[in-house]
Amino acid sequence: MSVATLSAPEKTRVIVGMSGGVDSSVSALLLLEQGYQVEGLFMKNWEEDDGTEYCTAKEDLADAQAVCDRIGIKLHTANFAAEYWDNVFEHFLAEYKAGRTPNPDILCNREIKFKAFLDYALMLGADLIATGHYVRRRDRDGRSELLKGLDPNKDQSYFLHAVGGEQLAKTLFPVGELEKPEVRAIAEKHSLATAKKKDSTGICFIGERRFSDFLKQYLPAQPGNIEAVDGEVIGRHHGLMYHTIGQRQGLGIGGLKDASDEPWYVLSKDLQRNVLIVGQGNDHPWLFSRALLASEIYWVNPVDLSAPLKLTAKVRYRQSDQACTLEQTSDGYRAVFEVPQRAVTPGQSVVFYDGEVCLGGGVIEQAEPWFEGRA
């Protein structure tokens, strides 16, 4: 059972990270009902240009304030834009510049929500923080474990894998025991302003604009050739950073002589030559990997890898658990899968599980092909 469901001492002060969404709104309400001293905090992590219509921060703040007014709690505001730029966004740009595909949400959780926000809340006198993430915390053997959320469609442990046990010990996850429809029902029952608000999608600082339009504001495009597996040049790309492994849309390839009607997919990036390598078919052999190498591993709690471990892993959000064997090598960590994995993407995260416990994860450095002969 999660500590978030236990009765709370009335003297425990909790500050809830209020995003202006339904999950954090209901989190604050549930904690209030459980007897905690509850306050909210809205964090601004991105400084948009004057007049922009992309960022929803103003609307989100208004929604968070409306919810806090409704349930009768104070709302603090904090600006972590400088920390976000230094610790999340610059890394995001560097990864794209290097031809990789990063996941800024994971860094944002580690550096902002469970570091900058946690530190700020403690400075305000909080005993604990809370968020609206769909995960659970279990305290066992003197340490706090990260468990999957009970709603398999909303479990967010993949995004929180880099948060340490010490930070988890100071955090409550009130909706981790619930399914999304239950959360919305609670919000509607209490007439919260966010009850029917759509879930946010995409990267927070990009909003609704096209990703390529956003990226070229910060990084110069480097056009190059698109090649088939046999080396034939069949097109041009605007920049490797705009493409990811397994991508189908936006390649601009079609009507080639002697080619089948099957769609084209990004198979690989040749960073040395600035070449995008593509092939036809959703199950093209080049799309599959039997193993991967990972670095920058963060464990929620220490893990003994003196011998290989049989675990499960996800190489992308909402993927089903994939059986693998993990071992530590001189180059980092190597995960070998029982079933070849499609579109293993350098820069993305691989996250490891032991049953419902999220152990941690790292950044995918390299995918190993599942057959001989691939470049």
UniProtKB/Swiss-Prot annotation:
Residues 103-105 are annotated as: Interaction with target base in tRNA. Residues 154-156, 316-317 are annotated as: Interaction with tRNA. The lineage of its organism: Bacteria, Pseudomonadati, Pseudomonadota, Gammaproteobacteria, Pseudomonadales. ATP binds at residues 17-24, 43, 132. CDD domains: MnmA_TRMU-like (cd01998). It is found in: Cytoplasm. The active site is at 108 (nucleophile), 204 (cysteine persulfide intermediate). One of its GO terms (biological process) is tRNA wobble position uridine thiolation. It comes from the Bacteria. Keywords: ATP-binding, Cytoplasm, Disulfide bond, Nucleotide-binding, RNA-binding, Transferase, tRNA processing, tRNA-binding. It comes from Stutzerimonas stutzeri (strain A1501). This is tRNA-specific 2-thiouridylase MnmA. GO terms for cellular component: cytoplasm. Belongs to the MnmA/TRMU family.
